[in-house]
């Protein structure tokens, strides 16, 4: 499928389908392709190129496809080895989740469920994911990693567990209710 992430050759290089013509695909490989040739195996992941949005994003240093350069350097050395596979954000690190919503609240996409104080000046808001609306049936503060459930929402399609991690396709714009003009610049 167009824009799906693929793994190329036995080295599992990261690529993306950028053109389809019949049963042939053109693939943009995001790593060094030396030594590759026609007929290499290609395995589709079935998902589009996406980024992980969660606490830990602000403190990280990433390459263009959100590979965590500091974690890669710690595990593999200063050179990025071809075909390595690591999670974009640290899925094990725990963050203190502070609830803003309460059980019984009616919420919809973009509403704040709580926050994580990611840095002394950055408060990372945890929002109701796109496409989710309903009543908060569970929400608890405490220490969680980004994949653990911090809230549950009863929707028309059943109960939905909410964690602090959202994966978002890079080629799809983020929805918003209104555009807010900046009140003061963030000087870094």
What name fits each language-model region?
Residues 24-29, 68-74, 125-126, 137-138, ...:
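Short, solvent-exposed secondary-structure boundary/capping segments
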Residues 30-33, 55, 101, 107, ...:
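Electropositive phosphate-/nucleotide-binding environments in soluble metabolic enzymes
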Residues 74-129, 145-188:
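P-loop NTPase nucleotide-binding/switch module
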Residues 17, 61, 112, 136-138:
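Conserved hydrophobic positions within beta-strands
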Residues 1-73, 78-81:
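N-terminal accessory targeting/assembly segments
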Residues 1, 25-31, 91-102, 135-139:
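Short alpha-helix capping/helix-loop boundary micro-motifs
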Residues 20, 64, 100, 116-119, ...:
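Residue-level recognition of beta-strand microenvironments
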Residues 11-14, 33, 46-51, 67, ...:
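Short, charged beta-turn/beta-strand-edge "cap" motif at the junction between a beta-strand
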């Amino acid at each position: 499928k167009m824009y799906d992430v693929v793994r190329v050759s036995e080295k599992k290089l990261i690529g993306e389908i950028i053109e389809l013509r019949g049963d042939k695909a053109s693939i943009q490989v995001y790593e060094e392709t030396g030594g590759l040739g026609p007929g290499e195996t290609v395995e589709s992941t079935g998902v589009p190129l996406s980024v992980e949005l969660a606490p830990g994003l602000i403190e990280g240093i990433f390459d263009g496809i959100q590979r965590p350069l500091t974690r890669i350097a710690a595990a593999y050395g200063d050179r990025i080895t071809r075909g390595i596979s690591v999670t974009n954000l640290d899925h094990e690190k725990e963050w203190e989740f502070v609830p803003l919503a309460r059980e019984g609240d009616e919420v919809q996409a973009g509403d704040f469920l709580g926050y994580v104080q990611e840095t002394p000046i950055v408060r990372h808001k945890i929002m109701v994911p796109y496409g989710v609306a309903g009543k908060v049936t569970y929400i608890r503060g405490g220490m969680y990693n980004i994949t653990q459930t911090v809230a549950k929402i009863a929707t028309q399609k059943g109960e939905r567990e909410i964690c602090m991690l959202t994966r978002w396709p890079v080629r799809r714009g983020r929805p918003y209710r209104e555009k807010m003009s900046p009140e003061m610049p963030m000087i870094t």
